[in-house]
């Protein structure tokens, strides 16, 4: 599930719902452009372990989403297609990242800070 502020750009609103779905809506009509499944649970995890998502974040015309279990998913803002899925090795990400220029700074549950470019 997601629990962050939606991103609004142009006529689109991007938001992650409680079921781990990234949704693109029309800002004026609330019509749904597309829905992309990010994953409510991590593979192999019990249903009690929700895969919480940080995001969405619009960076360089791409939508970035980071899971509690250290998975990064980059999504096309136009089609909702998942362009990249990658393990970033950060478990316990619960605090929104800091985004500066071309870098993303993320901390884990042990207060370690990581930089991604």
What are these regions, as identified by a protein language model?
Residues 23, 27-41:
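Histidine/lysine/aspartate-rich catalytic loop segments that bind and position anionic ligands
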Residues 52-77:
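C-terminal hydrophobic structural anchor segments
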Residues 73-91:
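C-terminal/domain-terminus segments
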Residues 26-30, 76-80, 117:
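Short loop/turn segments that connect beta-strands within beta-propeller blades
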Residues 1-9, 35-57, 85-101:
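Extracytoplasmic beta-rich repeat domains
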Residues 13-15, 23, 62-65, 104-106:
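Conserved beta-propeller blade signature
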């Amino acid at each position: 599930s997601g629990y962050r502020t939606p991103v609004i750009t142009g006529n689109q609103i991007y938001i992650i719902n409680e079921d781990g779905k990234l949704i693109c809506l029309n800002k004026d009509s609330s019509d749904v452009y597309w829905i992309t499944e990010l994953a409510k649970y991590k593979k192999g995890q019990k249903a009690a372990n929700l895969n919480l998502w940080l995001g969405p974040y619009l960076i360089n015309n791409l939508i970035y989403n980071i899971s509690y279990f250290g998975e990064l998913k980059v999504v096309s803002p136009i089609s909702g297609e998942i362009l990249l899925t990658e393990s970033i090795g950060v478990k316990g990400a619960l605090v929104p990242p800091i985004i500066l220029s071309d870098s993303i700074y993320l901390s884990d549950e042990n207060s370690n800070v990581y930089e991604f470019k």
